[in-house]
């Protein structure tokens, strides 16, 4: 007797990934974008969320969609500035990959969280986001809440 497939869980990040086919612009100046985000983060009392990835990476698109949707999207828009850092085929933005301790051998997307002074607070050094399509929405929300700037505090 065949079993019925389980209904899709609303907690899984996997969702429609249409719309933005280009998240990582080939002409983007990632160091400049990070500097601009840090300046803005200081005035807006936010953190900077760096997403290392590439347009060919399905899970990068899944994570981006999740970061703009639901509770996670609300937290990101209120508490973070998002910067996409293009890795191309793996060699692009190598200095940033090293600076923010992103081990590409663990896969992408990879995430780093910076305070408004540019201090690295978190780096996904174990490939925690590599299989974004299997992450639970609630786990992403917990992650964002952990690293957001609390109201009434600075940087």
Regions found by a protein language model. Name each.
Residues 106-153:
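Non-catalytic, surface beta->alpha helical segment in thiol-disulfide oxidoreductase systems
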Residues 48-51, 81-85, 110-114, 121-123:
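Structural recognition of the beta-strand scaffold that forms the well-ordered cores
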Residues 55-59, 66, 87-92, 118-120, ...:
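Solvent-exposed loop/turn segments at secondary-structure junctions
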Residues 21-28, 83, 129-133:
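Second-shell loop/turn segments in exported
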Residues 44-57:
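Short active-site neighborhood of thiol/selenol oxidoreductases, capturing the structured segment around
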Residues 28, 52, 65, 69-94:
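Thiol-based oxidoreductase modules, predominantly thioredoxin-like and allied folds used
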Residues 4-44, 152:
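N-terminal leader/targeting and pre-domain segments
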Residues 42-43, 74-77, 102-107, 116:
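Extracellular/periplasmic catalytic domains that process cell-envelope and extracellular macromolecules
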